[in-house]
Amino acid sequence: MWGYCLGLVEIGNVKSKGFTLMEITIVLTTLAFIALAALPVLLDIHRQTYAAMLHSSQSSLGTALKFFHAQSVIDNAYDQEHVHYIDRQVKTRKGMPEASADSIRALLEIDLPARGYSKIDVPCKGSDFCIIGQQHPNSAHFVAIPDYQFLDKSGVDRVVYIWPQGYTLAEEACYFYYVNQASTDSIVRGHVTQGC
């Protein structure tokens, strides 16, 4: 007698439970193909997440710079070496924060290493972001910024780089930056996300 009942197949007097090896292989192969098809989408979502995080952090820096500039104007502090900003002393250069790790740490409310600077050739770990400042085209840890040329090569203009956990600054283009162009009394900020 042939009969089917909730996964039980009766063949003669022998009862078989479960799936055959062929059925399991087909299901696993199908799942593997679905996973492979979804992988590029998941990787792109990961890249977009880091790019959005950098854009957001860079925008926060822009807002902090506007508040800092307003504080400098109110205090008439253009030529001062330090400006008191939200319970912190921020070292300045030509009226704007210098491009140092300490100055950016004082401006941003993001998880950065407590002091010093990060190694650019080792993946960032221990905080959400890593940072290195006071770089210029002739410095040891300088990383060229795509589509940006330093006007002054002598070291007057300086840059600070901030990159996310898990990335290296030296090898991956996934960071945001702030340039104090003291040679022209201006600043530049932006983000690079090609390597995220």
Which residues does each predicted region cover?
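Membrane-proximal N-terminal amphipathic helix
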Residues: 49-76
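Alpha-helix boundary/capping detector
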Residues: 11, 68-69, 87
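N-terminal single-pass transmembrane signal-anchor helix
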Residues: 2, 13-49, 53
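Intrinsically disordered, low-complexity regions enriched in Pro/Ser/Thr/Gly and acidic residues
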Residues: 86-196
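Extended amphipathic alpha-helical segments with heptad-repeat/coiled-coil character used for oligomerization
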Residues: 80-83
